[in-house]
Structure formats: C-alpha cells, structure tokens
C-alpha cells in the first residue's frame, strides 16, 4: 500500500446558506447584476447599499479607515521621521515568514528611499526560533542604530525589549498578535491592544507596515514615497498570512495584485518569472506560487535572502536570488513529502485514528512540520501536532479544525511544555524529549474531550442553487467581481442538483474529471488531488458544489466546475 493510499478520503458534507430571494432581486435591480450573482451576494449578507458598492468597486479612498485611528501610529511616524532626519539609525527586526519579511522589506524600502539609515534583521529559525532575541538587540546597538523597530513580533518579547532599553535603544513594536499585556516598548502599535480595535484587528503585519508607510509619507511629501507604490509588498503578507480578505485587507490585496502585475521591482519581476506568472496575477498565484518560494527561504536556510530579493535594484542579482528560492522550494517540497509520508506511516501503524493526532521523529525537519500538520488535518480532519528535534529539544507545530482553538488547547497542556504560542487556527511549542509521549497522550485526551462539542466532519457551504443552463462564460466573468478570493471571501460556491455522471476519467493518476449532464447541457467537473470518490460513478445522479470556471486548453475554452463536494442525489 502506498503512502497516498493510507490517507483516508474525508468526504465533505453539503450545506446551503440561508437564501434571501427578495434582497437578491433588489441587488440585481440596483447594481444591474445577474440573478445568480445577486443570490450569492444576498446569501452572504449583502444588502443593496454603500457596503455592497464598496465591495463591488473597492477604492483606497472610500474603503480604508483613517490611519490616525490606529493607536500610536502618529507618534511612531513622528518619531521615525525625527530619528531618520537626524541620522540616528533605524534597525528593523522582522519575522521569517512571508508576512514578516514582506512587512519588513516594505518599511525598509521606504526608509531607504527616504534617505534614512536603516537595516533589517531576521532571526534564524533553527538556532534562534521565532521572535526578537538578544543577539539581534545587541547587534543593533553594536552597529550604531538608535531605534529598534519590530514588525510581526514584539508583543510578548518583554525580556528582549527591557534589554534594548538598558542599552539605550528607542523601541517601536508593530505587531498583530494576541495581547495579554502591553510590552515595555516606547511605542506600541497593535490593533488588539486595549483602546484600539483598528480595522477590527484583522490587519496582518504587512498591512500594518503599509499603514506606517502611509503615515510616514504624509510627513515627508515626496513623490517617490507614494504609499500606493508599496502595495505590491503589502499584498504578499496579506494574502499569505491568511487574514480575512474583507474590508481593508481586500482593498490592499486587490490593489496590491494590480501593482504586482505591473511591478518594476527586480526581485518580484524575477520571482514572477520563475513562477511562470505573467500579467494577470491572482491570489492563487501568490498563495501557491510566490508565497511558498518566499517561505522556503526561512524554512530551509534564512529569511534574509527574501529581504535581499525584495529590496534589490540589481536585476541580475534578483534573477540569481529568485532561482535560489525556487531551488529551496523544490527542496522544501521533497522534505515535506518525506516527513508527511513518515507521519502517515506512524498514524497507520497505530490503528484507529485518534481524536488528536501527534507524529514525531528526531529526523523531522522543523522547517516543514507546520505544513505537514496542515496536511494531516486535511486528511483526517482532526487537530494535528507534528514534532521535530532541534537545539536539544522537540519543537512542535499544531493545526486545528473549526471549533477548536489551538492556543487554548496548548494552554491546557502547558504543564508538558517549555514554551508555546499561537492563535485559534495554529500554534507552536517546545518540550523536553522525556515529555513527548506524555504530551501525545494528553493531547489526544484533550482533543477527545473537545471534539464532543464540535462537528467532526468538514462541510462545504454553498452560496446558492443554480441550474446548469444558468452557467455561461458571461456569468463566470461576472463572478470574478468577487476577487480577490481567500479566507473570509471564498469563491462563489454553487450547488447543482440531480446531475447524471456521464463519464469519469483519471488525469495524471491524481485528479478526477467527471462529465456531468442535466439532460440538456454538459459540464466537466474536476476533483483535484482525488483519485476516486464513492458518489462519482457512471450513471449516478449527484448533487455537486463547486466553483464555476473557464478552462482554456490549447486555445479551446470550456466551462468547468471545480468540485468541493459531491453527494448522491436524494
């Protein structure tokens, strides 16, 4: 039996959102939209009002909150300008994921263009781990920078910030993680702090970094410092950090993707080339092409490669760095596959799948354990922890399911852990080797308890029912007005009932292609990364949920449904 066959086929159940036909009619009339698109919008809670107008035609001017509403932003901008103009030196310390690296690059690039002396520091994932550390603080002081500006961490770095203060550094923290208590920074920017709530706390570090640039540009009055020119970097973190693509995030992502399509940054041009991305850039291109290559640097070697790539003005250097990131990503994929297969073997050898999955091995590469944990959740729909060994202790990464908060789960198991942190969907921790088995048992027991109160089967929420005859190329183009798509703004999911399976074909030994008919019309239904499905049998009558798309192959265009769920029709 191959490792792929060890993965169970977790079938998704179909749910239909509550329908509001009268509101759909009003939307169709007010905005000249098709009945189908209007039904989707009304099912998502939209009314024919200003909010829907801003959604359909998002603009920077009308759709973004005032920067001055972000607590302490004005003070930070004033102080950074003061330090920059006095040549006192500004050191940026950022995380090694796409959000931290794009946010750090964005602010660094702005400061460089403003003529402010600055430098970027990135922690080493393997020897130092996440967050601000003593080495960075001392290096900042050693190299003559008087301000330490953190991006994507700092909220919980009390000890390191106190050291910075002892060394005479002025500290500014820009972060978006959960706040228990404010850190000892001179200026603290975090929407989650008491008295803030800016943009409902949904902005990632790159988004906050862009807002900092907006505030700085208003004080420096230089055409080269137009904040719109930095949206290509801001959108990278916004999309890859999986924040809700609603409100300000959706506008940053949308305008950023437009900039990215025509970017002149040598690093992004080179990266697009190795990804095979041309003019039209979508969220998928960032999520599955550009993002993984940027992440590969921090996972496999050092995030500093990304800072170099995103900020260089040398096209030849950018080309070399992009190729290096592409190679690192291939290595990351191979390493991920090895760790995933070993984890699957461990789970299979234990018999029944537990409520909480824990897989560990001293040889697991700690740069990919988070991705593998997510793959296990996708396979089994159970909270999953994957652990590797590094620096004399086990380091773990956890991914959860809907209804189970990972950070609360880890908090309940803190007696076994040296450190832990995270949020509802994901978290990380470390523990001593002697505690691993005890942790695995406790993790399963706690998950067993938590899963009694949550759905243990994944589901797909259909926005509306549609007839196959309604699906036309014009409708598919109209549905693109929902883009950019992502967390909090998924692609319109259409429910088509009682279609007959006319034919089934397996493509590249990996993907199912079904020919579906309502008796009059035909459409192809694709189930990606699925070799078989119990409902997809020739002759069956099925209900399907998926995204309508147009597949262009060798110049031929045909309508296609990318299927998320299939059930035998009642």
Where are these regions (language model features)?
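Hydrophobic helix-and-loop "lid/oligomerization" segment in the mid-to-C-terminal part
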Residues: 9, 17-22, 26-147, 167, ...
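Short nucleic-acid-contacting surface segments enriched for D/E, G, S/T with interspersed K/R
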Residues: 531-545
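Active-site cavity-forming subdomains of large catalytic enzyme subunits
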Residues: 138-202, 206, 210-219, 246
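Beta-strand/loop nucleic-acid-binding surfaces
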Residues: 520-535
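OB-fold/S1-family single-stranded nucleic acid-binding modules
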Residues: 554-570
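Short, acidic/hydrophobic/Gly-rich beta-strand patch recurrent on exposed beta strands
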Residues: 359, 513-518, 526, 561-564
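Accessory interdomain/linker segments of ATP-dependent helicases and helicase-like nucleic-acid enzymes
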Residues: 457, 462-523
């Amino acid at each position: 039996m191959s490792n792929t066959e060890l993965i169970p086929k977790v079938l998704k159940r179909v749910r239909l959102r509550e329908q509001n036909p009268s509101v759909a009619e009003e939307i169709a009339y007010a905005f000249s939209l098709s009945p189908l698109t209007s039904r989707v919008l009304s099912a998502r809670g939209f009314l024919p009002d200003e909010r829907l107008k801003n959604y359909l035609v998002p603009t920077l001017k009308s759709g973004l909150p005032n920067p001055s509403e972000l607590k302490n932003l004005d003070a930070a901008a004033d102080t950074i300008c003061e330090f920059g103009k006095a040549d006192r030196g500004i050191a940026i310390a950022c995380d090694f994921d796409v959000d931290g690296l794009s946010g750090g690059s964005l602010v660094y690039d702005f400061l460089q263009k403003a003529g402010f002396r600055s430098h970027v520091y990135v922690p080493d994932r393997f020897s130092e781990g996440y967050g601000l550390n003593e080495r960075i603080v001392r290096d900042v002081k050693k190299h003559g920078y008087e301000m330490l500006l953190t991006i994507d961490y700092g909220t919980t770095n009390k000890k390191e910030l106190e050291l910075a203060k002892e060394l005479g550094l002025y500290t500014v923290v820009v972060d978006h993680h959960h706040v228990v208590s404010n850190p000892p920074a001179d200026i603290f920017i975090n929407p989650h702090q008491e008295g803030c709530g800016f943009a409902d706390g949904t902005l990632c570090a790159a988004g906050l970094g862009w807002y900092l640039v907006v505030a700085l540009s208003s004080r420096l009055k230089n055409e080269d410092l137009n904040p719109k020119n930095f949206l290509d970097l801001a959108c990278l973190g916004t999309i890859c950090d999986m924040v809700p693509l609603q409100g300000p995030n959706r506008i940053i992502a949308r305008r950023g993707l437009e900039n990215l399509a025509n970017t002149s940054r040598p690093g992004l041009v080179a990266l697009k080339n190795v990804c095979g991305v041309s003019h039209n850039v979508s969220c998928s291109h960032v999520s599955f092409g550009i993002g993984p290559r940027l992440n590969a640097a921090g996972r496999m070697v050092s995030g500093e490669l990304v800072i170099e790539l995103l900020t260089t003005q040398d096209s030849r250097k950018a080309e070399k760095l992009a190729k290096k990131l592409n190679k690192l990503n291939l290595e990351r994929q191979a390493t991920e596959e090895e760790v995933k297969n070993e984890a699957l073997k461990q789970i299979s050898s234990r018999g029944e799948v537990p409520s909480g999955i824990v897989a560990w091995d001293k040889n697991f590469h700690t740069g990919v354990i988070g991705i593998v944990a997510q793959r296990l959740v996708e396979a089994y729909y159970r909270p999953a922890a994957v652990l590797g060994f590094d620096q004399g202790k086990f380091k773990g990464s956890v991914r959860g399911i809907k209804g189970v908060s990972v950070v609360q789960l880890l908090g309940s198991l803190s007696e076994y852990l040296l450190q832990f942190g995270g949020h509802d969907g994901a978290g990380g921790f470390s523990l001593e080797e002697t505690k691993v088995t005890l942790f695995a048992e406790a993790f399963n027991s706690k998950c067993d308890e938590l899963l009694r109160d949550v759905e243990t089967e994944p589901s797909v929420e259909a926005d509306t029912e549609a007839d196959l005859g309604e699906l036309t190329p014009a409708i598919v183009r109209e549905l693109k007005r929902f883009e950019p798509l992502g967390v909090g703004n998924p692609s319109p999911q259409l429910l088509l009932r009682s279609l007959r399976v006319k034919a089934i074909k397996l493509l590249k030994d990996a993907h199912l292609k079904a020919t579906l008919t309502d008796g009059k019309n035909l459409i192809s239904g694709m189930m990606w990364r699925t070799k078989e499905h119990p409902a997809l049998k020739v002759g069956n009558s099925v209900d399907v949920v998926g995204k309508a798309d147009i597949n262009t192959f060798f110049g031929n265009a045909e309508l296609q449904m990318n299927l998320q769920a299939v059930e035998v029709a009642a």
